[in-house]
Structure formats: structure tokens, C-alpha cells
């Protein structure tokens, strides 16, 4: 139990090869007009909304960091995008999705009791098993001396998935 959620952060992306922007449908405005947001970002959004019990955000902002060149008369599409969602009670979520950065598919849930880290929240690294760390760090303050001590444990869960071998 992480306690009440204060912030969620997630990232899903991969580095497309040198021909990606020119040849892949994900970078073609007529075939995937939302680019990395439509292909990858929705995983981050759904994770955040699921963790927040489907609560609607109060407001949402986003920024395109990089976009494709227009192709064959079609508009450009986002190649790198970040977003922010604000929820009632002061909770928030941020995410980044990209076709132009090293592969990443992590999520972090910060609560007032603990931190939950998931390094493979979209595609399990091994078969149908996802792992997460539940971290309960302790901040020790003695007058002007302070120390941060990490405490936590790794958990594994079976995930029904079509990605599982066999």
C-alpha cells in the first residue's frame, strides 16, 4: 500500500531506426495522426487513470518536443511528447512518450507511505511476469545530521498476456 497517491510518472518509448520516420506508419500523419502519443502515450495515460480509480483530471497539458516532417501531403506527427494531468486533492501525473529515445517502459507511483516502481508496465521483460519494487524509505534527522535509508522489496506477478511464450 503506497497510501494516497501524490504523483504518478511514466515513460514509454523506443528509438526508431534511421528509416523509421520515413517508412513507419506510426510517423505518417494520415495513418497515425497522433504519432507517439496515439501509439505509446495512451499506455501511460491509461496507467495513470487506472491508478487514480478512473477519476477525470481537472486539467491536462501537453507539449510536443519533436515532430516528424510532413509526408505525402499528410501533417507532421509527434515523435516525442510529454503530458501532465492534475487531479482533485492535489494529485498529479506526468508522462513522456517517444520514438526518439532509448527503450523505456517504466512507471512510478508516489504515495504518502511508499513508492511503487514498475520497470516493465507495458510489455513484461520475461514471459508473462511483471516485477515491481515497493519502497518505503526512511528519512532520519538528528539535529543537523540526516540520512536517507532505503527499504523495500521486489514483487513479481503473473500477467495474462499474448506475449507469454508457449
What is each of the regions a protein language model found here?
Residues 1-73:
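Predominantly a Rossmann-like dinucleotide-binding segment in NAD(P)-dependent oxidoreductases
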Residues 1-4, 10-15, 31-32, 55, ...:
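Domain-wide signal for the mature, well-folded portions of proteins, strongly enriched
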Residues 16-21, 77-78, 142-147:
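Short hydrophobic/aromatic-rich motifs at helix boundaries and adjacent loops
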Residues 26-31, 76, 104, 145, ...:
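Exposed boundary/loop context
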Residues 41, 98-100, 164-166:
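Short beta->alpha junction loops/turns
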Residues 44-129, 133:
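Contiguous beta-strand/loop segments that form the cofactor/metal-binding neighborhood of enzyme cores
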Residues 110-166:
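C-terminal glycine/acidic-rich active-site capping loop/insertion
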Amino acid at each position: 500500500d503506497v497510501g494516497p497517491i501524490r504523483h504518478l510518472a511514466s515513460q514509454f518509448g523506443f528509438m526508431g531506426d534511421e528509416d523509421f520516420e520515413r517508412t513507419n506508419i506510426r510517423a505518417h500523419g494520415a495513418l497515425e495522426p497522433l504519432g507517439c502519443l496515439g501509439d505509446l502515450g495512451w499506455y501511460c495515460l491509461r496507467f495513470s487513470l487506472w491508478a487514480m480509480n478512473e477519476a477525470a483530471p481537472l486539467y491536462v497539458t501537453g507539449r510536443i518536443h519533436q515532430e516528424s516532417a510532413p509526408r505525402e501531403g499528410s501533417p507532421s506527427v509527434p515523435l516525442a511528447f510529454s503530458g501532465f494531468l492534475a487531479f482533485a486533492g492535489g494529485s498529479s501525473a506526468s508522462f513522456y512518450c517517444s520514438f526518439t529515445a532509448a527503450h523505456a517502459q517504466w512507471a512510478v507511483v508516489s504515495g504518502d507511505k511508499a513508492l511503487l516502481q514498475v520497470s516493465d508496465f507495458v510489455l513484461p521483460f520475461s514471459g508473462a511476469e511483471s516485477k515491481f519494487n515497493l519502497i518505503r524509505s526512511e528519512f532520519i534527522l538528528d539535529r543537523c545530521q540526516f540520512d536517507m535509508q532505503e527499504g523495500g522489496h521486489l514483487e513479481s506477478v503473473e500477467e495474462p498476456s499474448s506475449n507469454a511464450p508457449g
